[in-house]
Amino acid sequence: NLYQFKNMIKCTVPSRSWWDFADYGCYCGRGGSGTPVDDLDRCCQVHDNCYNEAEKISGCWPYFKTYSYECSQGTLTCKGDNNACAASVCDCDRLAAICFAGAPYNDNNYNIDLKARCQ
């Protein structure tokens, strides 16, 4: 769920507030359209697409689905006791948090004009 995703981001990018990722580029945060502005925004586009795939599992609601995972020294592991939906959502969030850690953060892409830049 979103609370767990926030904590995964804190695990892989402890130097930044997770809020920094809640309104970034065209895809980080609510919705998503147009061309991603950079690598970090591409991480969010992939995450959005991953959630769309997870939603194809019967009764799977990625934003609310809780799952079992572990954070140890910046390394995320999804636990084996997750059902198909939980495993899928956990992996979406894990891969996005790892992607965030490897992508440069450009302050100019925070809280951008979506209408102007994300067509």
Curated annotation (Swiss-Prot):
Reaction(s) catalysed (UniProt annotation): a 1,2-diacyl-sn-glycero-3-phosphocholine + H2O = a 1-acyl-sn-glycero-3-phosphocholine + a fatty acid + H(+)
Annotated tissue distribution: Expressed by the venom gland.
Xref: InterPro entries: PLipase_A2 (IPR001211), PLipase_A2_Asp_AS (IPR033112), PLipase_A2_dom (IPR016090), PLipase_A2_dom_sf (IPR036444), PLipase_A2_His_AS (IPR033113)
Catalytic residues identified in the record: 47, 93
Sites where the protein binds Ca(2+): 27, 29, 31, 48
Gene Ontology cellular-component terms listed: extracellular region
Cofactor info, note text: Binds 1 Ca(2+) ion per subunit.
Record's subcellular location: Secreted
Keywords: Calcium, Disulfide bond, Hydrolase, Lipid degradation, Lipid metabolism, Metal-binding, Secreted
EC numbers on record: 3.1.1.4
Cofactor(s) this protein requires: Ca(2+)
MF (Gene Ontology): calcium ion binding; calcium-dependent phospholipase A2 activity; phospholipid binding
Keyword Hydrolase in record: yes
Complexes and interactors: Homotrimer.
Protein function: PLA2 catalyzes the calcium-dependent hydrolysis of the 2-acyl groups in 3-sn-phosphoglycerides.
Name the record gives this protein: Acidic phospholipase A2 2
